[in-house]
Amino acid sequence: MCIRDRYWMLPNGEWAYSFGKTQNVNRNLGWEEKKEWNLGVDYSLFGNRLYGKFDYFKRTIDNLIYEVAVPQPPYTQNTQWQNIGSMEVKGWEFEVGGDIIRTKDFVWSSNLNLSHNSGKIATLWGNNTYKNGNGFVAPGSPGDAARMEEGSTIGSFYIWKFAGFDDEGNFLLYDKDNNVIPAKDKTENDKRYVGNYTPKLIVGWSHTFTYRNFDLGVNLRSWIDFDVYNTINMYYGIQGQGNFNVLKDAYGKFSHIKGEKQICDYYLEDGTFLKIDAITLGYTLPMKKYTKNLIDRIRIYGTVGNVCTITGYSGMNPEVNITGWDQGTEKFWDTERFYPMVRTYTLGMQFNF
């Protein structure tokens, strides 16, 4: 039995939705258009003992496609994919590498890569004056920590500015006129752009040391000068926030906080880090004379992955998601990404024929 072919009655007497529109059609939706120019120089000197490159790019994306809120009615669903505006991105990348030391028995090779990117929303069209994102989950209603609007820098947090605590341990914030107000009196208009989760500099640095038949490889990586929103401290660092466990710091360095949590720059931290991603030690055995040229050589190696992280960030991992305009937080509610990276140990053999 059905009603308008969209609902079916189940054996228990309940009506179940069978089929219908799940998205609003937009017949005016067009392709995103990308325009980009690059200026680059590649170089190799001293018989390729020193090499590298430098690239600078500027990219404009028009007809940005994004899912925006629409009224019901006339629309059947509350969102629709639309072309909403344009974005500008620019950046550079520099690479240098080569043999630092080269002797008969010993070679030290190194490769250094530096990059920087920045972007902004150039225009928003139609009724899309702004778009909020990076919403925080319950308990409570913390709100959103990002806003996309004309002229906004990609990676900025759109949050309240912390002004201190009152005598009862409640948050004090700055309003739009820089007056200090109790957090309970705040409005959305008092939010401002604070900090940025886009690293000012991304660094990759690899080293390879070879001594006769031994080889040692070390890979390092660093993000420099960027902000991370420590949601763990915000949710679990305050006493009396619900029926769940809290951090030890809730009764230590955060014991003075008694009021409701607030999305403000009190929880922004510098996420700068240096990671040793991997260390590999190997030994190569010549095998031609032992296998009648069947095997040229065998390399035995061991690798330690995720060796260590050096950072001043107090959370679990400063390397948060920085892809998109509403990231930069340790989202503990995203279980697929929240678990810490484990250290790995690998033993292997490589056969060359």
Where are each of the predicted segments found?
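C-terminal extracellular loops and terminal segments
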Residues: W81-S86, Y130-F157, V194-G204, T208, ...
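Exposed, low-structure sequence patches enriched in small/polar residues
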Residues: N113, G126, S156-F165, F171-D177, ...
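Membrane-proximal, glycine/serine-rich, low-complexity loop/turn segments characteristic
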Residues: R4-M9, N127-Y130, T153, K161-F162, ...
